[in-house]
Every structure is written in C-alpha cells, then in structure tokens.
Amino acid sequence: MKKYEVMYIIRPNIDEESKKAVIERFNNVLTSNGAEITGTKDWGKRRLAYEINDFRDGFYQILNVQSEAAAVAEFDRLAKISDDIIRHIVVKEEE
C-alpha cells in the first residue's frame, strides 16, 4: 500500500449539513475501496488564489490516506463529476 495526500476544495455556498455529507461521502468512497484514512484536516473557508467557477473562496479538506491506486483513482473520477468539489489534487507521498 502506498501513502497519498488528498486535498479538495468544496464550493463555498454550501450549507453546513450538506458539507458534512460531501465529506462523509468522499471518505466512504476511499474506505469502501480498501483505503485507510490515517489523518484528516479541515482547513475551513479560505480565499482562493484565483477565481474558480465564479467562486472566490472555498472549504479546504485534506486527507492522508494509505491505499492502493484503484481507491484513489475512483476518488479522482467521482471528484471530477461532483458539482460540490470545485478543485482536487492527489499527491503520492515519498516513502
């Protein structure tokens, strides 16, 4: 299993309940595909460096994950489709 850091930005005009549902749904995508979430950080609402989809800020979420590539690929696929996530990145950590 490899270690990954996943960062995604949730659109800012979402209510608190829906935000929690999005976080839970994407955590479940990883865990149901065999990933182990070793750490999570909620950076809260931050200003973006540039406008994305007419949004100037967003809710940052960072996950440290230990998994196979398939779980991360599924997260990546679903994050691209989701309207709630305006930007995401997955980085493989050095051993």
Swiss-Prot record:
Give yes or no: UniProt keyword Nucleus.
Answer: no
A GO CC annotation given for this chain: ribosome
**By its UniProt entry, which SUPFAM superfamilies does this protein fall under?**
Ribosomal protein S6
Show the Pfam families listed in the entry: Ribosomal_S6 (PF01250)
- Gene3D superfamilies according to UniProt: 3.30.70.60
Q: Which cysteines are joined by disulfide bonds?
A: none
GO terms (BP aspect): translation
Q: Which InterPro entries has this protein been placed in?
A: Ribosomal_bS6, Ribosomal_bS6_CS, Ribosomal_bS6_sf, Ribosomal_S6_plastid/chlpt, Transl_elong_EF1B/ribsomal_bS6
Q: Name one GO molecular function term.
A: structural constituent of ribosome
UniProt keywords, alphabetically: Ribonucleoprotein, Ribosomal protein, RNA-binding, rRNA-binding
The record, for NCBIfam families, names: S6
Family according to the record: Belongs to the bacterial ribosomal protein bS6 family.
Function noted in UniProt: Binds together with bS18 to 16S ribosomal RNA.
Read off the PANTHER family from this record: MITOCHONDRIAL 28S RIBOSOMAL PROTEIN S6 (PTHR21011), SMALL RIBOSOMAL SUBUNIT PROTEIN BS6M (PTHR21011:SF1)
Q: What is this protein called?
A: Small ribosomal subunit protein bS6
Supply the source organism for this entry: Bacillus velezensis (strain DSM 23117 / BGSC 10A6 / LMG 26770 / FZB42)
Q: State the encoding gene.
A: rpsF
